[in-house]
Amino acid sequence: MSLERSTSPNPTERTSLLSDTASTISSRDDVEQSSLKQRRTPIPTGQLGGKVSMHSIIINAEGHLWPYINQFVNDIGVSDGNPRNVGFYSGLIESVFACGEVCSIFMLSRLSDRIGRRPVLLPSALGIAVFTALFGLSSSFTMMLTLRVCAGLLAGATPIVHSIVSELTDDTNNALVVPLYGLITPIGFAIGPLIGGTLEHAATKYPNVFGYELFRKYPYFLPSFVPCCMAIVGVTFGYFFLKETLPSLVKSKKRLERQRSSSSISSENSTLYGATEHIRDSTEETAADEEPDSKPKGITELIRDPSIRAIMASGTFLMFLYTSSDVIFSLYCFTAVEDGGVGLPPEKIGYAFSVAGLIAMLMQLCITPWVLRTFDKAKVYHFCMCSFPLVFALMGCLNPLAQTGYSEINKTLHPTTTGLLYAAIAILLLLARVCVMAFPISMMLVKQTADKHSLATANGLVQVAMTLARAFCPTISSSVFAYSTSHNILGGHFWVVVMVFISLVGVWQSTKIARVTKTKEQL
């Protein structure tokens, strides 16, 4: 039969040729359709910049305190002049910020699910800026606590930013946008501590530039005022570029726009191609309108989801351990070598945190996108949690290292010891910043498991779990550190044993995320 076809007359050859041509065209269409499906959704740069500015305000409101908060508390006089008691009070200041955040997260998240993201986020960010500046004018410990609580109440809008990211992205651009969003935290934690460590007591350090009476009377006002100015710029940028992303409001806006322009569009689409495009667009929009408007799920219903519960539980350990590493590191560096610390000045502490932020920034920019595209997200999350036991174990080695070259007479370190100490701190900071990848992954896991109509509430639940950990973490971790050093338990290193144990429990808890997400995918 094949031989007969090869010797057939022209009509059959023409038929075969047409068939081959049609097949080629069909294959080309399939390739084009496949490429369209795989094409990455364009990233709205204006929107991305708007949410970056909003999130950076919350980060800077906290990061600028780390280098000088212990010295600030000591100068206020609440610790009775004993540096070993500073840790408890400085931890309390950091805790009340998170406590205020816990109290407002649910209310602000639910409110944003009803009235929109912008009306809640922009005023909250502006309020944080004001209370951040006022903190530098504190003259009593009570005033410090009050201002931090007020700022924390407004910082409860953090999950709204997470929801905006989820609503702006899809599966085609998640691996790029989420690491970029996660880049905000290390950038903020690089800039904030640098501002705090450099500008505290600016009138004394730089009398020719900041030698004003205001900065002499309030030596911690300038490092609080600069983040406030940056926040005001961020709010202004967000006001003009951050658009509403709440799905129900976006759909209502599109429906109104379509109704207004339906008559003009019908007249303009007179050609066959235009009419076809109009019919296709109308069909898609009608299908979107016919999609039922599901109400947001309640808190109880979301908590019943095993995936949400696993992310909440593991997120609690993640935030507790991550915050503990920063709190203890700051206190560890502030404490004198003979008291069980490293004995660095606030300026050097600020530089250390800035370097840590730069390391995290490079990881988020260069490594995280590739990791998210290559490996399973739940397994990467578990890997990040596994780094915490090593972080605290290595941190406990800094004081013994410093003691090898410490002169009790001159209160100085030998140059060789100083070099080794800085090298160890660099390795520690590099290892600690590996954990940063877990935060954007947690947000992506919430998006995978939560209903889109309840996204802000689901993010709020996870954020509440994390914020509760951050509320109690500074007080607990700093108290454990102070107790172990003041009572010289295990040579002042009892806190290392406690933190390593908690880290191992967190590692075990993170294994549940991989199990529940795999189970949910199989359903």
Curated annotation (Swiss-Prot):
Record SUPFAM superfamilies: MFS general substrate transporter
Topology of this chain in the membrane: Multi-pass membrane protein
Domain of life: Eukaryota
Gene3D superfamilies per UniProt: MFS general substrate transporter like domains
Membrane-spanning segments: 88-108, 125-145, 149-169, 175-195, 221-241, 317-337, 352-372, 382-402, 419-439, 455-474, 488-508
Region of interest: Disordered: 1-45
Sites where a glycan is attached: N269, N410
Location(s) in or outside the cell: Membrane
InterPro entries in UniProt: MFS, MFS_dom, MFS_trans_sf, Sugar_transporter_CS
Single Gene Ontology MF annotation: transmembrane transporter activity
Compositional bias (Polar residues): 1-26
Keywords for the protein's UniProt record, in alphabetical order: Glycoprotein, Membrane, Transmembrane, Transmembrane helix, Transport
Key word Transport present: yes
A GO CC annotation given for this chain: membrane
UniProt main location, coarse: membrane
Biological role: Major facilitator-type transporter; part of the gene cluster that mediates the biosynthesis of psilocybin, a psychotropic tryptamine-derived natural product.
Family: Belongs to the major facilitator superfamily. TCR/Tet family.
Protein known as: Major facilitator-type transporter psiT2
Gene that this polypeptide is encoded by: psiT2
